[in-house]
Amino acid sequence: MAIIASTFGTGLSYAGELPFKPVTGGEVGRKQQRMVVVRAEGGGGINPEIRKNEDKVVDSVVVTELSKNITPYCRCWRSGTFPLCDGSHVKHNKANGDNVGPLLLKKQ
C-alpha cells in the first residue's frame, strides 16, 4: 500500500502530476486551489498481513469518558459515515477475501 501524496507542515510532497494548476506571477490575486489525493495501491485487500488467521480483525479500546457505551470507527475507508463505521467492510471483505473490521471504543 502506498501513499500518493501527503502534507508535511506547510509544505506539500507529491508523486506524479499536480492535481491543480499552480498560481504563476501573471495570476496575482487569484486564490490557489490545492487538493491532496491519497489512494491505496495494490491488490483488493486493505489488510495484507495482520492477523490473517481471524475472520475479522476488530480491536476494542476501553475509554472512561465517552457519551455512548460503544462507538465503532471505520478502518476500511469505505464507510459512508466516515470516520464512524457503517458496516461497509462486510461487503468489501466478501468481495476481496479480506478480514478488516472496525475499531471499537467502549465506555468503561
Swiss-Prot record:
Keywords: 2Fe-2S, Chloroplast, Iron, Iron-sulfur, Metal-binding, Mitochondrion, Plastid. This is CDGSH iron-sulfur domain-containing protein NEET. [2Fe-2S] cluster binds at C74, C76, C85, H89. InterPro entries: CISD1/2 (IPR045131), FeS-contain_CDGSH-typ (IPR018967), MitoNEET_CISD (IPR042216). Disruption phenotype: Late bolting, early senescence and increased tolerance to abiotic stress. Binds 1 [2Fe-2S] cluster per subunit. Coiled coil: none annotated. The gene is NEET. Its cofactor is [2Fe-2S] cluster. Plays an important role in plant development, senescence, reactive oxygen homeostasis, and iron metabolism. Acts as an iron-sulfur transfer protein. Changing H89C: Increases 2Fe-2S cluster stability 10 fold. Loss of iron-sulfur transfer activity. GO terms for biological process: leaf senescence; reactive oxygen species metabolic process; regulation of autophagy. One of its GO terms (molecular function) is metal ion binding.
